[in-house]
C-alpha cells in the first residue's frame, strides 16, 4: 500500500503550505505553533488551495515525487499528473507532448529521474 501523503499549493500566496491536514470531510486545517496560546488549529478556505498527491516514488536523490512535479529522465522532461479516471499517475513528456500511464512510469527508469521543479513555481 502506498503512503498517503500530500502537499498543498496556496494559489493566492503562491507557496506550498506546511503543517496542513485534511479532515475526514475534506476540510483543510493548518497547525500553527508558537502562538500566544501554544498550538493553534486554523480552518483553511480550500477554494484557492490545490491538493497534490504523493506518487509513492522517489527520484534518484531520494526526494518524494508528487503530482505537479517536473522530472527529468536522461534527456527528456516530464510533468507528473493525476488521472482521476483510472486513479493513477500519468507522466507527460513536455517536449514531445506524449502521455504515459502509471505502469509506464514504473518501468521508465524513474529511479534515475531527478525532480527539476514543479508546475507552480517553474512555469
Each model region followed by its residue ranges:
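Secondary-structure transition motif
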Residues: 1-123
Amino acid at each position: 500500500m502506498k503512503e498517503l501523503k500530500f502537499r498543498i499549493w496556496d494559489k493566492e500566496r503562491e507557496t506550498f503550505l506546511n503543517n496542513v491536514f485534511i479532515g475526514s470531510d475534506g476540510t483543510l486545517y493548518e497547525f500553527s505553533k508558537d502562538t500566544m496560546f501554544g498550538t493553534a488549529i486554523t480552518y483553511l478556505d480550500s477554494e484557492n488551495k490545490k491538493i497534490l498527491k504523493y506518487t509513492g516514488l522517489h527520484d534518484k536523490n531520494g526526494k518524494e515525487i508528487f503530482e505537479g512535479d517536473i522530472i527529468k529522465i536522461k534527456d527528456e522532461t516530464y510533468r507528473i499528473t493525476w488521472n482521476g479516471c483510472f486513479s493513477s499517475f500519468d507522466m507527460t513528456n513536455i517536449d514531445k507532448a506524449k502521455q504515459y500511464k502509471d505502469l509506464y512510469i514504473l518501468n521508465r527508469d524513474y529511479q534515475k529521474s531527478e525532480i527539476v521543479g514543479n508546475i507552480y513555481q517553474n512555469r
